[in-house]
Amino acid sequence: MTLTYMNIMLAFAISLLGMLTYRSHLVASLLCLEGMMMSLFIMATLIASNTHFPLINIMPIILLVFAACETAVGLALLISISNTYGLDYVHNLNLLQC
């Protein structure tokens, strides 16, 4: 395993640890989730560039689209919660149910 792959996996592990540690605030959770998605994107791009299989080249683009969608939904929830309650705590998400 090269040092590049190890650094990317370490970035994913640190983001996962941050997600588990700072799960009470929505902003910190979204930031850690974005770090996880970016490390997965870089890993998928490296794998796609090292293998010469043509169908795998679309995988990083699909992953980037999903990352953008989860960011948009997360920020919409953050704005909704902060406008309603003034706080960014994750436990306020249960109050948004119908």
From Swiss-Prot:
Give the record's keywords alphabetically: Electron transport, Membrane, Mitochondrion, Mitochondrion inner membrane, NAD, Respiratory chain, Translocase, Transmembrane, Transmembrane helix, Transport, Ubiquinone
**Any S-S bridges, and between which cysteines?**
none
Q: Which InterPro entries match?
A: NADH_UbQ_OxRdtase_chain4L/K, NUOK/Mnh_C1-like
Pfam families, alphabetized: Oxidored_q2
**Intracellular or extracellular location(s):** Mitochondrion inner membrane
GTP-binding as UniProt keyword: no
What does the entry list under GO cellular component? mitochondrial inner membrane; respiratory chain complex I
* GO biological process terms on file: ATP synthesis coupled electron transport
Q: Tell me how this protein sits in the membrane.
A: Multi-pass membrane protein
Q: Which reaction does it catalyse?
A: a ubiquinone + NADH + 5 H(+)(in) = a ubiquinol + NAD(+) + 4 H(+)(out)
Residues spanning the membrane = 1-21, 27-47, 61-81
Q: Which family does it belong to?
A: Belongs to the complex I subunit 4L family.
The record's function comment reads: Core subunit of the mitochondrial membrane respiratory chain NADH dehydrogenase (Complex I) which catalyzes electron transfer from NADH through the respiratory chain, using ubiquinone as an electron acceptor. Part of the enzyme membrane arm which is embedded in the lipid bilayer and involved in proton translocation.
Provide the assembly information.
Core subunit of respiratory chain NADH dehydrogenase (Complex I) which is composed of 45 different subunits.
What is the name listed in the Swiss-Prot or TrEMBL entry for this protein?
NADH-ubiquinone oxidoreductase chain 4L
- Taxonomic source organism: Macaca mulatta
